Amino acid sequence: MGYEKRSLGSFEGRKIYEILLSLGYDMKSAQRICDKHRVTDAEDQNLHKNSVAHGEIFLIDYKCEPRGLKPIFECDAFAVFDKPSGILSHPSGRNSPYNMYDEIWSLYGQDACVAHRLDLETSGILIVAKDKDAARELKECFEQRRVMKSYL
């Protein structure tokens, strides 16, 4: 897994967020992309949302490289994976190795997220929310301790 740099095209005199909106991103997504410094110019300089484009611009985007790990259970709202030891629950930066998000996003898209974390060395059950509503509900369940976690 990793991030890849792909061209969004060549633009002159337009603000970065306007370009992202014209390419189909909603305002919230465009802002998040800019806030995470994922838009650059040809010299790899980060472009902020109000920066004005002069030439080709690039998006640094997550590239999933799934290995075929499948959920052991799933329903409409969430999925359950048996996370092996030695795999990160989530990426830890742009040079992150294979992690559970390679599987999660390739199966459910980028709105899916882990409901809790397991350490790199820890194997066990990992609950994945398939969308933002499910993520909010699962987070609340963990916060209110309606979900029991145990370690062997």
Annotate each predicted stretch with a short phrase.
Residues 1-152:
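RNA pseudouridine synthases
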